[in-house]
Amino acid sequence: MSLDDLIAMCRAKLAHLSQLRPSAVSLGDTEQVERIDAEAIKTQQTLNQLLTLA
């Protein structure tokens, strides 16, 4: 798997998480919102690290 593939995967995951979050918010599922936010933060940090290598 190339660096570009990993970057694309991180971007796709962030896009997916950003689509999931509004549903969790509207349902009032604060635990799910917190999990989504935590996963988004980890994914963004990984993406930032990958971009410094690119």
What are these regions (language model features)?
Residues S2-L20, I36-A40:
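Short amphipathic alpha-helical heptad-repeat segments
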Residues P22-E34:
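Charged, low-complexity interaction regions
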Residues M1-C10, T30, N48-T52:
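N-terminal targeting/docking segments
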Residues A40-A54:
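Amphipathic alpha-helical coiled-coil segments
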